[in-house]
Design a protein with these regions (language model features):
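Glycan-recognition and processing domains
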Residues: 6-72, 90, 95-99, 132-134, ...
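Membrane-embedded transmembrane-helix bundle of lipid-linked glycan/lipid transferases
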Residues: 2-27, 144-583, 689-728
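Extracytoplasmic
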Residues: 191-194, 214, 218, 568-625, ...
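Extracellular carbohydrate recognition and processing domains
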Residues: 94-121
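Extra-cytoplasmic beta-strand recognition segments
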Residues: 62-83, 113, 141, 658
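Extended, low-complexity, turn-rich repeat/linker tracts enriched in Gly/Pro/Ser/Thr and Asp/Glu
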Residues: 79-87, 132-135, 654-655
Length: 728
């Protein structure tokens, strides 16, 4: 009880300090673009123009060409002139600045003005228009971003980490040996997080796609959706339903951080660090539970955290979904182990981890499902003999019910013909040559040599994992005498290595992908890249390697773990260094362009170029007044004596509702797939259009919520029973 009181007091103090930092406005950061006339503005005729020397009127410059998030900005200038001139602010995607024109009066010299961007603006132009007088000289111009709260969030995260360590210490979980193990694993996390410890986001393979997903999610949250189905950031405000087809449950935290004042680079980099830390923790817990050996858990955690495929997922591919799925992959393997070989009452772990993987990345779910089916088929006799079919069925049911809130909208839109068919690829074309698995760093790949993404990043198992797996085999083969439990551990480690080898083979040209494509009638194309199977190889080899290295250490676990850390870090650092030095990035104060060109998960026939028109179109005879927009919602006063149509700058996805003074109106996806409202004759009142979703979706959300609550209650009751048994 005393420990609980101390923990609660520490929690209260931690929350109080965090609240104080935010309320006092501490830790703010602002981006300043200084000396714009000398850096980002291009003056065709020079910064100074004199009519007496042959100069002429007109816009003097172009630039800075920034992509800026919505918000309030301050512009300062020092412009000498004897006439009244104008600074004009525009964007390349139709986002409006208010005011869009700033007067510069004769003889004013220096001045400043606040302006607001109503939404994210691509290719922002701040142009000086020499409109009157005989001379002008643009001496200086500076742009100030909104104030971001990155420092406050950094303090909050550090305070939360310190509190977690204090609680572990308070409950006796952080003794001298535990501290040593934590330091070694923490070093692996720190090294793996190197490229995230800066205020920029490197541009990788899928950076743009996933950052727009994140910003779209943040927009949906900011405008009251929960869970988010559609957001109004993508496609220049026309909206996207990526949250339905690409689960983003675990992106809610960085999205909420952004809505509370964090910059995009800070939120994303904090997410990457969290992914690394949680991946390390998940592998540690799983290896310790399976092998009952602390140093096996430490070595496995280090191997997994610094595995080259996982690191490439984070910092080369920027594969938000797959990297998040790899957080839960060790827990999935642990759950599968328990249900098939261990404590079959642990089926909730298998169900919950499978659900978390699905809610991270659907393709990773397919790989995990294939793994589970293969294991069950291989050990079907054992499963039937020991009565393990029911726990497996319960795990499957739990996973399905937990994901119902995501599955039901997904199925709804899929039945309407929305999907990502254009992303399907022939897996045989992208299979690796076997030699690639044994390289260090980027190597030559099969496929189109013009595809730079496939020729400039590491697609391999990695030396540390290969050595770990090899030593696991050696430890099992060279052991002369062992008890039954040790033999079981050795056998399971060998099984893990064999499974990892199989998945590695599936990533290469050795696997008959052409035949698989025929047998599955093209369904295998949705896997896109066979080298995705290396994610499973990394997890399996890390588990087996951690155990083998701990056995091979022969009582010198500390030294072995330190050696594993050194070797794994040395093999990972070349890739980490390249990514940290990436000179293509999104800087602090900037954002990703909302002018999205991807057409997956859109209505058939969508043309992204049409989204550059942000205007509302109305038929002749339809009067509009007081038009207001809030995310994906529109309000306006309308009058149409003879009826008519209004086309809004929104894609007409199923789930919108149109009302005139509270009465439902019909709408359709019209020209350019715009949401087009049909007004009846004599319409006169307030038009309201908003994304409401469907009642069936709400029912599915209730099912998932009740399932999660039930599993949590089961876990709590089980823990209390075990605690009571220990006391007796």
């Amino acid at each position: 009880m005393k420990r609980r009181k101390k923990a609660l007091c520490a929690l209260a103090l931690c929350l109080l300090l965090i609240a104080a930092v935010f309320l006092l406005g501490l830790g703010g950061a602002q981006k300043t673009w200084e000396d714009l006339p000398y850096t980002l503005l291009e003056f065709e005729g020079g910064r100074a123009i004199d009519l007496a020397q042959g100069g002429s009127y007109g816009e003097m410059n172009r630039g800075p060409g920034l992509t800026l998030p919505a918000g309030e900005y301050r512009l300062k200038w020092a412009i000498d002139g004897d006439g009244d001139n104008v600074i004009r602010i525009t964007s390349g995607n139709g986002a409006a600045a208010n005011p869009a024109e700033i007067p510069v009066t004769a003889g004013s010299g220096e001045g400043s003005c606040l302006f607001t961007l109503d939404r994210a603006a691509e290719n922002v132009q701040i142009r000086v228009d020499f409109a009157s007088g005989t001379r002008i000289d643009v001496r200086d111009m500076r742009l100030y971003s909104p104030m971001y709260r990155d420092g406050a969030f950094a303090f909050a995260l550090l305070a939360a980490g310190a509190y977690a360590l204090y609680v572990l210490h308070l409950y006796g979980r952080l003794g001298p040996k535990a501290r040593g193990r934590l330091i070694l694993v923490g070093m692996a996390v720190l090294i793996a997080s190197g490229p995230a410890l800066k205020n920029t986001i490197g541009i990788g393979h899928d950076t743009t796609f996933h950052l727009v997903r994140l910003c779209n999610l943040a927009d949906g949250l900011a405008h009251g959706q929960f869970p988010v189905r559609a957001g109004g950031y993508a496609f220049n405000g026309y909206g996207a339903i990526t949250s339905v087809f690409y689960p983003d449950v675990f992106l809610y935290i960085p999205a909420m951080m952004m809505n509370l004042g964090a910059s995009l680079p800070f939120a994303v980099n904090a997410f990457f660090v969290a992914v690394n830390a949680l991946s390390a923790a998940a592998m540690y817990v799983s290896a310790k539970r399976i092998f009952r050996e602390e140093w096996a858990a430490v070595c496995a955690s280090i191997l997994y955290t610094l595995s080259i495929y996982r690191i490439s997922d984070v910092f080369t591919r920027y594969a938000f979904g797959e990297m998040t799925a790899m957080v839960f992959l060790p827990l999935f393997l642990l759950g599968l182990y328990e249900v098939v070989w261990g404590e079959k009452r642990s089926w909730p772990l298998l169900g919950a981890s499978a659900a978390c993987i699905f809610l991270s990345h659907m393709l990773s779910t397919v790989i995990c499902a294939l793994t589970a089916v293969g294991v069950c088929a291989l050990f079907i006799v054992r499963i039937i003999r020991e009565g393990r079919i029911l726990p497996i069925a319960k795990a499957c049911a739990a996973a399905g019910l937990l994901c119902a809130f995501q599955l039901v909208p997904f199925i709804t839109y899929s039945l309407e013909g929305i999907g990502a068919q254009e992303l399907a690829k022939d897996p045989a074309f992208y299979a690796l040559h076997p030699a690639q698995l044994f390289l260090l760093g980027a190597g030559e790949l099969s496929g189109d040599p013009a595809d730079w993404r496939l020729s400039t990043f590491a697609l391999e198992i990695g030396l540390p994992l290969i050595m770990g797996a090899g030593i696991a085999l050696y430890a099992a083969a060279a052991r002369e005498a062992a008890d039954t439990q040790t033999k079981k551990k050795d056998g399971f480690a060998v099984l893990l290595v064999c499974a990892g080898v199989l998945f590695a083979v599936m990533a290469t040209t050795l696997f008959p992908w052409s035949h698989v494509r025929v047998l599955t009638r093209g369904l295998s194309d949705y896997l896109q890249f066979p080298w995705r199977f290396l994610m499973m190889t990394a997890a399996l080899f890390a588990l087996a390697g951690g155990y083998g290295l701990a056995v091979y250490a022969r009582g010198h676990g500390e030294q072995m773990a330190a050696a594993v850390l050194a070797v794994a870090a040395l093999c990972a650092l070349p890739t980490l260094t390249d990514e940290a030095r990436n000179n293509h990035f999104i800087a602090f104060g900037e954002t990703v362009s909302p002018n999205w060109q991807y057409t997956e998960y859109t209505l058939p026939g969508t043309k992204t170029a049409a989204t550059l028109d942000p205007g509302v179109r109305a038929d002749e005879g339809v009067e509009l007044a007081q038009v207001e927009r809030d995310g994906l919602a529109f309000r306006a006063q309308v009058r149409a004596a003879d009826g008519g149509e209004i086309a809004l700058p929104l894609f007409g996805y199923d789930g919108y509702r149109a009302e005139l003074d509270g009465q439902a109106l019909a709408w359709t996806a019209g020209e350019d797939n715009r949401l087009t409202v049909k007004l009846p004759a004599g319409a006169d009142g307030e038009l309201r259009v908003y994304f409401a979703g469907k009642a069936l979706w709400r029912a599915a959300e209730g099912v998932s919520l009740l399932t999660a609550a039930g599993l949590a209650a089961m876990a709590l009751l089980r823990k209390r029973k075990e605690s009571g048994a220990d006391k007796r």
